Amino acid sequence: METQLQSIFEEVVKTEIIEEAFPGMFMDTPEDEKTKLISCLAAFRQFWNGLSQESHEQCVQWIVKFIHGQHSPKRISFLYDCLAMAVETGLLPPRMVCESLINSDTLEWERTQLWALTFKLVRKIIGGVDYKGVRDLLKVILEKILTIPNTVSSAVVQQLLAAREVIAYILERNACLLPAYFAVTEIRKLYPEGKLPHWLLGNLVSDFVDTFRPTARINSICGRCSLLPVVNNSGAICNSWKLDPATLRFPLKGLLPYDKDLFEPQTALLRYVLEQPYSRDMVCNMLGLNKQHKQRCPVLEDQLVDLVVYAMERSETEEKFDDGGTSQLLWQHLSSQLIFFVLFQFASFPHMVLSLHQKLAGRGLIKGRDHLMWVLLQFISGSIQKNALADFLPVMKLFDLLYPEKECIPVPDINKPQSTHAFAMTCIWIHLNRKAQNDNSKLQIPIPHSLKLHHEFLQQSLRNKSLQMNDYKIALLCNAYSTNSECFTLPMGALVETIYGNGIMRVPLPGTSCLASASVTPLPMNLLDSLTVHAKMSLIHSIATRVIKLAHTKSSVALAPALVETYSRLLVYMEIESLGIKGFISQLLPTVFKSHAWGILHTLLEMFSHRMHHIQPHYRVQLLSHLHTLAAVAQTNQNQLHLCVESTALRLITALGSSEVQPQFTRFLNDPKTVLSAESEELNRALILTLARATHVTDFFTGSDSIQGTWCKDILQTIMTFTPHNWASHTLSCFPAPLQAFFKQNNVPQESRFNLKKNVEEEYRKWKSMTDENEIITQFSMQGFPPLFLCLLWKMLLETDHISQIGYKVLERIGARALVAHVRTFADFLVYEFSTSAGGQQLNKCIEILNDMVWKYNIVTLDRLILCLAMRSHEGNEAQVCYFIIQLLLLKPNDFRNRVSDFVKENSPEHWLQSDWHTKHMSYHKKYPEKLYFEGLAEQVDPPVPIQSPYLPIYFGNVCLRFLPVFDIVIHRFLELLPVSKSLETLLDHLGGLYKFHDRPVTYLYNTLHYYEMCLRNRDHLKRKLVHAIIGSLKDNRPQGWCLSDTYLKHAMNAREDNPWVPEDSYYCKLIGRLVDTMAGKSPGPFPNCDWRFNEFPNPAAHALHVTCVELMALAVPGKDVGNALLNVVLKSQPLVPRENITAWMNAIGLIITALPEPYWIVLHDRIVSVISSSSLTSETEWVGYPFRLFDFTACHQSYSEMSCSYTLALAHAVWHHSSIGQLSLIPKFLTEVLLPVVKTEFQLLYVYHLVGPFLQRFQQERTRCMIEIGVAFYDMLLNVDQCSTHLNYMDPICDFLYHMKYMFTGDSVKEQVEKIICNLKPALKLRLRFITHISKMEPAVPPQALSSGSPAPQANQVPTALPVTQ
C-alpha cells in the first residue's frame, strides 16, 4: 500500500532540478495545477476504491505523514489542496482527515507554516464532520494549543492564530457544528472554575463560557447556600442536602459556569446540622458516610473542631455553667457527636486535638477548658486500652496551652455536678499514666504541678472504703479509674449495690404475690450525666448481665424498681447505643424470651412503652417484628402478657412518624409478614390508619390514583390475607384516594347483624339446655367454635343477673389470644343490642351490665373493649350507637373518670426528674388495683374460685396509660363522624388531662389537624377544643411560651363562634420570625431551654416547626388564606422582615408551608400564574433589560432593584426545595394544564425554565415519570412561544438548557414526543436542536395546528432504565 501511495504522490510533487535550484522563480499556471490535481485524484480514487474499509484510516494517516514529511510549503499547500478536493468530492471522510491531521505527532507549533496550513485546511473541511467528531476535534485542538508556551516570538503569532480561527468556527453559534453544550463541557474540563484559558485563545473561550451562565442560573436554586433543613430522626434520606464528602460542595450536574457561591464548600450547612442534637444520621446521609466502611472525612473533622472552638467562645461569655443552660446543652451534645464520629473513624482523634491546639493557641479562651477536657476524657477513657498511647499524647500539649497556672488548682466543691468537669484533666492524666505503665512505655508523664491537689484528693477518696451517694465522689472515682480494674471495682460496686438491693429485703409490686428486690430509688440523671461514657458502659453492661443471669435462673423475685428505672435512664444516651438500645433489642430481649422469663420480658416491654425516648425507627420496627413472633408463642397466651404485647405493638405502630413509615416498611418488602399481625385485626387496622396518615402527611400518593407498583401494595394485600376487613365509609373517605380504591376493590362480605343475633340466641339455647359441666366447657372453649361467648355472658347477666362458675371456667379455658375474637364479636353484638333497645329502663340495664362486665367482673379490660369498638366498621346510625357506647363506657360510671383524675392529679410525666415514682405508682395501684384474670367474676360465682395466676411485675403501667394510644384512635374516629362532635368535646373535657402523659402530644395534634384538615374545615370550635385540651393538659409541666404564641392564646382561645379572630400580617411575621430565630441559634432563643433527650422533638428547630404548624392549622382561617398570608411575609413589604436576612425568612416559610396540608401550599401555584401573566413577562416592551438579570434574585435584592417575579422565583425555590417528592409531583400537571396555555413569550418561557429547571435532578432520582412529563412540557411551551414570536432573542440559552436536560436527565426517554415538536419549529431553532432528534432531514411530522392547541404532549410509555450522561 505504502509503495503505491508513494508513487501516486511523488509523481505529483516531483520537480525539475532547475526549479529546486531557483525556488520561487518558476510558477505553475493554474491550469497546470488543476491538471496535476485531477490526475493525482484520479489515480488516488482508483487506488482508494480498491482498498478494504479497514485500511482507510491507515491510508489517510500515511498521506498525512507523507505531507508532513515535506519541507516545501508549496508542496504541502498543494498536497493539502489535493486532500481538500478529495473531501469535497466525497472521496475521503472529513472526520478521518481532520483527526489524522491534528493527531499527527509532527504537527508542532514550532513548524509555524505547517501549523497554519494544517488549521486552514481543517477550517475548510470541518463543516462536514458529524457533531460528535467535532467535539472530539475540539478537545484535541485545545490540548494541542496547550503545547504552545507562554512566550513566543511575535513574528509567529499570526501563523499560530490559524488554530484559534478553527476554535472560533467550532464555537460559532450560527454555524451549529455541534451542540454548544458539548463545547462548553470540553472547555470546562480543560479550564475548570478559576483557571484562565491559554493566551492564544484570549477571551474567545471565556466569552463563550459566559454565554452559559444563564443556563447555569436556570439550573440553580435561588439562595441555595442559605437554605437549611430541620433535622429529624426519621432516618429518611433526603437528596436535597447531599454534599461531596471530600470538598463539601453541592453535587452540581454538568460542567456549567454556576455562580461562585455554589462551588464553595458548604461549611455553614454542615456546621448547622452538626450543631443540632440527634443529627448524626443526617450528617452521615449528607456526606454518604457508611458505618461499615471506616473512612476518614477531614472536612467533617474540621467542622467538629470549629464547633468545639465555638463552644469555648460561648463559655467565655457565660457567667455560670448552670443546670440546663445553653452552654451545658452544647457541650453535652458535642461530647455525643465527637464520640460517634471518632468511634466510627470518620474523624481522627489525634488530628482533631492538634487542630484544636492550633486554633486555640494565643486566643486566651480558658473558661471552657474543663468542659473541653471532659469531652476529650469521654473518648480517651473508652478507647485508650485498644489504641496506641501516642494517639492520646497531643492532649498534654493542649493541657500546657489551657492550664498555664504555676500553682496548684484548688479542689472544687464535690457536691456540685460540674465538679466532675473540673477533675476531667486529672482523670485524663491518670488514664494516660495507666496506659504508659501497662505498655511499659518510656513515655511516663509526671503529674503536672497544677493538678497535684486534684490527684491527691482522688487517691485519698480511693482509700475510703465506705462511699456515700450524697456527693459526686463516686462519679469522680469511676471516671478516673475506669481503666484500672483494681481501683474501679470499689466505686462501681457502690453504684451497682445502690440499685440492685441487698438481696434480702423485698418490696411488693402491683397484683397478687409479686415481690421485687427492695431498692426503689434510681440513680439520678445528674449523677449519670457526671459519669464518663466508659463508666456508663460498665454500668449498663453490669445491669444487662444481671438481667440475663436472673432470666436464666428464672428468679421468683422481680428486678428492683431502682434497677429498672436506672436502666431506662441509661438507654437515653446515644453514645452507648451498642450496649444500650441496640443490646436491648438485639440481645437482651431475645435472650429473655428464649429463657421464658416472662416477668422480665413484661418489664422490658413496659420500659419500652413508658420510658424510652428518641429510639431510632429501625429499632422500633425490629421490636414490632419481635412482638408479632412473641404473640404466636403458646406461653404468651396469658392475659397479662398478651395484653402487654398488644399494647406495646399498638404504641409502636401508632407512634411511627409520617416520614419514617416508608423507609422502614420498604425494608420488609420481601417478607411483609414479619411486621404484620397474623391474627390481630386491631393491630393491622392501626397499621393501615398509620399508613393512611403517613402517606397523606408526606403527600406520597399526590397525583396518583392507584397503589400499583408502590411499597404499600404487598403490605395491604398481606393484611387482607391475614385479617380481611372493611372500613366504614366515613373513615374510608379520609384515606388517600389510592387506598380508598384498594379497599373498594377488596370489599369483604360482612356478617349481617340479624344473623349475629340469631346465632347468639341459638348458642344461648344450647348453653341453657346442656347439663354436663365438662361438655359445656369443652364445647364453648373449643378452637374454631363461633367466638360468641361474651355475648352469652351478656345474655346471662341480662336474664339472670349472674354468671355461673362454668362461665368462669370457659373464659379461663378460651385463653387470652382467642378471647380477642370474642371481644370483637361482642363489640358488634353490643351495637346491635343498643340499636334495638327500647330505651329508658332497658337501656339503663344494658349500660349497667356492660359496666359490670368491665369493672365488677373484670371480664374484659376497658382499653381492649374500646379499641375493638373504635375499630369496627359500622355505618350511619349504628356508627353513632357504637360511639355512644364508647362514651358511656368512659364517662357514665365514675370508675374510669376517677382513675384518670387521680392519676393526672398525683403524677408528673417528667419521670427522669423523679426519685419517688415507685411510691406513687404503688399507692395508685393500691387504690385502683389492676384485675386482669377475671377476679371479680371469680369472687361472684358460687362457690367463689380461688385465683391461681400470679401477676407479672408492673413497674410503670396502669389502665390510664394503656388507654392513651386507644384514646388517640377514639378521637380520630369521632372526628370522622360529624354528628358525634359534641360527644368528642365532652370526652376531651373529662379525659383530655391524660395527654399530660402522652409521649408525643404536639406530633399527635399536628398529625390530627393535618390528616383531618378537610374534616375540620368550618369546625373551628372543635379544632380549638382539641388544641386546648391537649396543649392545656401540659400547662403545669411546661414553662410559659413553650408552644403556642401569646397572640394566639390571647385572641384565638377566647374568640366567639360568631366572631372568629382573623390575624393581621404582623402575626404571621412574628410566627415566622420565631422559627428564623430558633434556626439561627439566637440566644436566648424564642423557646425555653429543655433537655432534648427527654423531649418529644430532637432539637429546637423541629419543635419550633411543629408547634408553628399546629398553631397555623388551629386558626379559624381557611388554609388558602393562611397560605397566602405566609407568602405575603416576604412578597409584600413588611416592616418586621429584615432585608439582609431575607433568604432565612424564605427558608422558614418553605419549611412551614410544606409541612402544612395541600390547600396551604398550593396557593403558591396561583402566585406563579399571576407573575407569569404580569405585564413584565408578557409584553416585550415593558422590560427592556436582560431577562436573566431580572430573574437573578440575589443581584436584584442586593441592588435594591427587586421585582415581584424574582421574589416569587426565590420563594418558589425555597418552598420546592423543602417539598417532599409527593408535593413536587404536582408540578408536571401544573405545567401542562395551567401554564402551557398561558406561556406565549420568551420571558415567560425562560421564567418557567428557571422555576422548574433546578428540580429536574430530584425528579430523576426520586420520580422519573414526572421528569419525563416535565421534559415534554418544556418543548410544548417552546413550540407555543416559537409560533407566537417573530424572532427569539434568547434562542441560545433556551437550546443550551434543553441540551443540558437531555444529557444530564432525560436521555432518549422523551425522544419520540420531542422529535414531532422540533419538526414544527422555525428553521433557526430547528437547526440548533437538530442534534437532539438525530433526524438528518427534518420534515414536519404533524401539522403545526395540531400541536399549537395547548394540549399536553403524548406521555412516554416507559421510563428509561439508564439515562446516558453523554452521547
From Swiss-Prot:
Residues 1343-1367 are annotated as: Disordered. It comes from the Eukaryota. GO terms for biological process: positive regulation of gene expression; positive regulation of T cell extravasation; protein ubiquitination; regulation of DNA-templated transcription; regulation of transcription by RNA polymerase II. One of its GO terms (cellular component) is ubiquitin ligase complex. The keyword Nucleus applies. Residues 1346-1367 have a biased composition (Polar residues). It is found in: Nucleus. Keywords: Activator, Nucleus, Transcription, Transcription regulation. InterPro entries: Mediator_Med23. Component of the Mediator complex, which is composed of MED1, MED4, MED6, MED7, MED8, MED9, MED10, MED11, MED12, MED13, MED13L, MED14, MED15, MED16, MED17, MED18, MED19, MED20, MED21, MED22, MED23, MED24, MED25, MED26, MED27, MED29, MED30, MED31, CCNC, CDK8 and CDC2L6/CDK11. The MED12, MED13, CCNC and CDK8 subunits form a distinct module termed the CDK8 module. Mediator containing the CDK8 module is less active than Mediator lacking this module in supporting transcriptional activation. Component of the Mediator complex, a coactivator involved in the regulated transcription of nearly all RNA polymerase II-dependent genes. Mediator functions as a bridge to convey information from gene-specific regulatory proteins to the basal RNA polymerase II transcription machinery. Mediator is recruited to promoters by direct interactions with regulatory proteins and serves as a scaffold for the assembly of a functional pre-initiation complex with RNA polymerase II and the general transcription factors. Belongs to the Mediator complex subunit 23 family. This is Mediator of RNA polymerase II transcription subunit 23.
